[in-house]
Amino acid sequence: MKAVGAWLLCLLLLGLALQGAASRAHQHSMEIRTPDINPAWYAGRGIRPVGRFGRRRAAPGDGPRPGPRRVPACFRLEGGAEPSRALPGRLTAQLVQE
């Protein structure tokens, strides 16, 4: 019976200690944030503000994606040839006929 009481007392003390530690960490982070910080003050001086305002985090889908790359649909002209200005008109006429 004494062993059960000792276990309950230990669990109670452990729960109180964990609850106290969690509440102290939350209060500490709230003390740092002051509402009188003006982000325009930093931006006007060429300083990039970092923190709760101005920080941009990269989304997982924004980076380069692995896989096949699209190849541009144009080719380099050889021999110093210049592109024809009438070519877009001819292509449009061919598409209309089809």
Curated annotation (Swiss-Prot):
Signal sequence residues: 1-22
Pro-peptide region(s): 58-98
Location of Phenylalanine amide modifications: F53
Compartments where found: Secreted
Gene Ontology BP, a term: response to peptide hormone
Post-translational modification summary for this protein: Amidation of C-terminus is required for receptor interaction.
Domain of life, source organism: Eukaryota
GO cellular component, as recorded: extracellular region
Key word rRNA processing present: no
Tissues expressing the protein: Medulla oblongata and hypothalamus.
Coiled coil: none
The entry's keywords: Amidation, Cleavage on pair of basic residues, Hormone, Secreted, Signal
Primary location group: secreted
Molecular function in Gene Ontology: neuropeptide hormone activity; prolactin-releasing peptide receptor binding
Record region (Disordered): 52-71, 79-98
Function, in words: Stimulates prolactin (PRL) release and regulates the expression of prolactin through its receptor GPR10. May stimulate lactotrophs directly to secrete PRL.
Protein name as it appears in the record: Prolactin-releasing peptide
Originating species: Bos taurus
